[in-house]
């Protein structure tokens, strides 16, 4: 499957924009420049592991396993556009930063989009894990949550299960969240 990308889009700059690609359940292959993720949840009929890469004018979506049906592919395309921020119109942003000597490089490199998670909940959990700690501790906390409380599919951890954490007692969640306790 291919998704047409916006004119001013850089796959590499977006996936490396602020570190989200380093946090589970995203996985990045920097040799082949692929971003891996398993989509799932109530919107899909099943779990859908994908690898995203860039072609000339499109983002290539490779399915790992059975190809999803038409309805799942439609929802998946919308989620991928959301994750890569295709819906962000950066024309005014580029016009403003293009006037500034120190920021003109952003226009030339199509920078400015920030990778985000498919759900607000996942972004919220990750943002909370960045508060008042180092990046190394953030990575440990997010990994502990995803790896200890999520499922694995095709070698990748599923984060949509984070949205189901409400049924867990706070003590159990804290044991998994605290860095270094479950090494």
Where are these regions (language model features)?
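HhH-family (HhH-GPD) DNA N-glycosylase catalytic core used in base-excision repair
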Residues: 1-183
């Amino acid at each position: 499957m291919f998704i047409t990308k916006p004119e001013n889009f850089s796959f590499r700059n977006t996936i490396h924009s602020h570190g989200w690609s380093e946090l589970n359940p995203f996985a990045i292959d920097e040799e082949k420049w692929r971003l891996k993720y398993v989509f799932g949840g109530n919107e899909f009929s099943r779990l859908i592991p994908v690898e995203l890469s860039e072609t000339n004018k499109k983002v290539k979506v490779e399915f790992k396993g059975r190809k999803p049906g038409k309805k799942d592919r439609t929802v998946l395309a919308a989620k991928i556009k959301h994750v890569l921020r295709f819906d962000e119109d950066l024309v005014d942003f580029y016009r403003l930063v293009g006037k500034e000597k120190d920021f003109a490089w952003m226009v030339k490199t199509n920078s400015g989009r920030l990778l985000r998670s498919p759900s607000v909940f996942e972004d919220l959990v990750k943002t909370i894990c960045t508060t008042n700690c180092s990046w190394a501790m953030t990575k440990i906390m997010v990994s502990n949550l995803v790896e200890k409380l999520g499922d694995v599919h095709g070698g990748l951890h599923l984060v949509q299960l984070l949205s189901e954490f409400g049924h867990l007692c706070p003590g159990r969640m804290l044991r998994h969240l605290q860095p270094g306790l479950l090494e």
